[in-house]
Amino acid sequence: FPINLKQFGNASIFCITLTCITYVLTYGKVLDWYDDPTIQWATVGAVVAGILFVYIEVTQRNPYYQFDVLKLRTIRFGFLFYFLLMVLNSSSMFVNVFTGIGMKLDNYQNATLGNWSMLGYFIGGIATIWLSVKGVHFKYLFAAGFLFLGLSAMFMYFEVQGAGLYERMKYPVIIRSTGMMFLYSLIPTFATQRMPYKYLSSWICTMLTVRMVLAPSIGTALYSNVLQERQQHYITRYAQNVDMMHPEASASFMQTVQGMQYQGKSKQEAVNMAATSTKGRIQVQATLSAVKEMAGWTLYACLFCMIFVVVLPYPKRKLLT
């Protein structure tokens, strides 16, 4: 068993560190970052627990986590590749945001789209096995994975519009899942090449920490915060030109007011509902513009990662014992 009772305390301290970091990343924007005392305490807890964990592991004879595992270049590469993958994989929110805001779909229909990821995983798994048997170098397989992630973002860039089709939203899900499977399955294979068995538990800890905790938390916080900021930017930008002097906005506003009055609403209620309707249309358009912009930047990031993993040196290393 990779952990005994004596090492359980070390693992608990490590989990406290990750919990505090995740709390700060998840609720920082909601709680206005360090103006909230809980964010301050969580940061202090993460720093103190992290330092305590490192101290215990360095001074203990049989540590839970062996820091020597980070001396292996393939492990460091695996750490980096997993981080890039899971951060960019947070772009999966584009489909949910677009279908929820632009198409007004419910959670069940959004969840149904997610089922198409199984097809992408199947395609990616078969392609990975076939290309590996053919002897294709790891760097080209990694590049293919990031390429598929970029193609998914590019599809969303051109597809995001006011008249998008629900049936077409399965394609970015399939493409993204295919690319994710390339990287998800090959990174541990590459990272553990000729790795001494004594580092197995440390590698598993590193892999799960990056893949399941740190990178998804950072990616989700990054994409959600940037989406909110760009959404507010476009709302301010579009609202500047929407007034009674604008022909289309004025006609739509007056039509809504008249429609509400025909339904028995008072003039004030009709005006308020027309203003709410106008605000809603601006918000939808701003959200779609923000998603399109972020999809474009995600495409650039994927292309950068694709080039990066190709030009990165993959030297042979000796077996460490």
Task: Outline where the language-model segments fall.
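Small-residue (Gly/Pro/Ala) motifs that create kinks and tight helix-helix packing interfaces
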Residues: L25-T26, N96, T128, I218-Y223, ...
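Transmembrane-helix signature of multi-pass solute transporters
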Residues: V48-A49, F148-F158, F304-V311
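Small-residue-rich alpha-helical segments with characteristic i,i+4
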Residues: M169-A249
